[in-house]
Amino acid sequence: MSKEIAKKRIEELRDLLNTFNYQYHVLDNPSVSDAEYDRNMQELIKLEAENPEFMSEDSPSVRVGGTILDIFEKVTHKSPMLSLGNAFNEGDLRDFDRRVRQGIDDANVRYICELKIDGLAVSLHYEKGRFIQGATRGDGVTGEDITQNLKTIKAIPLRLNEEVTLEARGEAYMPKRSFVKLNEEKEQNGEDVFANPRNAAAGSIRQLDPKIAAKRNLSMFVYGLANVEEKTIPSHSESLDFLGELGFKTNPNRRTCETIEEVIAYVEEWQEKRPHLDYEIDGIVIKVDDVALQESLGTTAKSPRWAIAYKFPAEEVVTRLTGIELSVGRTGVVTPTAELEPVRVAGTIVRRASLHNEDLIREKDIRIGDYVVVKKAGDIIPEVVNVIFDKRTGEEEEYRMPTHCPACESELVRLEEEVALRCINPTCPAQIREGLIHFVSRNAMNIDGLGERVITQLFDADYIRTFADLYALTKEQLLQLERFGEKSATNLIQAIENSKENSLERLLFGLGIRHVGAKAARTFAEHFETMDELVKATEEELKAINEIGEKMAQSVVTYFDNEDVLELLQQFKEYGVNMTYKGIKIADLQNVESYFAGKTVVLTGKLEVMGRSEAKKKIEALGGKVTGSVSKSTDLVVAGESAGSKLAQAEKHNVEVWNEERFLQELNK
């Protein structure tokens, strides 16, 4: 076959396969058999392999998955992916309607209602009609680049029907039938199953190997336009129509409503129809349809005033409580958990539910053998709502919390002003294991590849008992563990080695000193600069530090007044673990050339590692100016958790937005 004929045939096959994909995955109206589709796809793959010069990034063949990725790159959203406020009953919906009408002084507002798909929110970027990048929502400001995995979802067009530049937002999901099939395969292979379709979709999208994502049969509904160049669309409903015309899959069950009564009727209708859909929904999204009215209403500190998410009531089911199991956390708190006869709740099989503490068991008079009502708080965490007393037979057993720790048999105590029982034995194996899990966690030593499962394996093999033991691990020991090969063992040893270079605040937080969180650990590290200086500090010296109270100061002094702790610190030194502060002190910032010099910065939301007051001081010390509102003169917005209206203002004025992680990276350069 000549090159000219091959090129023509490749183009014919691409057009044909794109049409087949659109008919099947967007219109739900397939025109050919699977066998015919596969024959055409294999012919295309073969021709492209023989003629690589004709390969295209938007060829249908990329949907089978490509090269394995090393890591997901971070992506800062051009416009933040904000969350919505919630409504839980009819009264909440009527309150929303009242607020909207008061805000726009218009009794003729029209709403658009859409099914709230229970999946993974993503953004899709197109330039001149070609799909160039897709990203997860992340924290709303920064997500992860998952372009290659999204290309495997056939409901996402790789090329639009117009050469338009835009950003669309949507929800990637796994159909129920695909979820059932996937879990059956995992069970047959002896693998852990996914709890629900949402987790399955998220887990598939975040696979580093796109070929795995390609096999998972994901789909996607696009629910909105974040922006589009050279086009003004007056309403949300018209933007959805426009997206459909471009080739996107939009949900056909949307409806415009002229009154709140029509909205409520729509909610009630889909609450009944919900089980019959082939995908999970967890509520209804209600939006003011008119875009000009949306802009007039604006946003609150947390969410848009012009939209709300109605959450379906948590599904409640009845099952029997067969026992109560106890777990011991890293601080020694003993928590009771109900063991249940397996029951399906909100799409997953539930076998355990939280009981929180002894007082709750007494308050609800929960006994072993009781029939209880179980629901998922927020459709996520199973909990016991109440006992069905009419079903009692008299054979149920009252439960009494033990007097001794279930893990080490030490006597349990209830500290002053605390509800929980606590084990105070420092050598309790359960506390040690949970402490190790905390030590390697993201905000502490951040050792990649060392999570709860691996820590448990290492602990059970008696390879680790203290934090310092982690730094004595060998590749040979790891190779003795299940699921470890040469590459994974080498990578983990390297990750542990890399953690030795962490700044002091990470080590301090990882030690798990009572009352000392990530922010306080950073405060101590910056103030004392070395572990040795902190160890020598008195309670009075600690209390003299801004925002350090008496309880925390006492806790720190008590922690370091322990020979075992001092021995641990000595071992860290011998293994080469850094115990000095590597960040920048405010006093040192005056002479530093910085990005922030001459910049106007706005801080919004909750900053986890560094408080806003401390961040303000450091920016100002670097020559920057911190203001309370966003304007055209603002250079940067630093957004923490629960950032709200200032993000919308940043988008309006085209101001760059950073999350806390990006801010700290720049600050510590």
Curated annotation (Swiss-Prot):
Zn(2+) binds at C405, C408, C423, C428. DNA ligase that catalyzes the formation of phosphodiester linkages between 5'-phosphoryl and 3'-hydroxyl groups in double-stranded DNA using NAD as a coenzyme and as the energy source for the reaction. It is essential for DNA replication and repair of damaged DNA. Its cofactor is Mg(2+); Mn(2+). The active site is at K116 (n6-amp-lysine intermediate). It holds the Pfam family DNA_ligase_ZBD. CDD domains: BRCT_DNA_ligase_like, LIGANc. GO terms for cellular component: cytosol. One of its GO terms (molecular function) is metal ion binding. Residues 591-669 form the BRCT domain. The keyword DNA damage applies. This is DNA ligase. Keywords: DNA damage, DNA repair, DNA replication, Ligase, Magnesium, Manganese, Metal-binding, NAD, Zinc. NAD(+) binds at D34, A35, E36, Y37, D38, S83, L84, E114, R137, E171, K287, K311. Its EC number is 6.5.1.2. It comes from Bacillus cereus (strain G9842). HAMAP family: DNA_ligase_A. The gene is ligA. Belongs to the NAD-dependent DNA ligase family. LigA subfamily. PROSITE patterns: BRCT, DNA_LIGASE_N1, DNA_LIGASE_N2. It catalyses: NAD(+) + (deoxyribonucleotide)n-3'-hydroxyl + 5'-phospho-(deoxyribonucleotide)m = (deoxyribonucleotide)n+m + AMP + beta-nicotinamide D-nucleotide. Gene3D superfamilies: 5' to 3' exonuclease, C-terminal subdomain (1.10.150.20), 6.20.10.30, BRCT domain (3.40.50.10190), DNA ligase/mRNA capping enzyme (3.30.470.30), Helix hairpin bin (1.10.287.610), Nucleic acid-binding proteins (2.40.50.140). One of its GO terms (biological process) is DNA repair. The keyword RNA-binding does not apply.
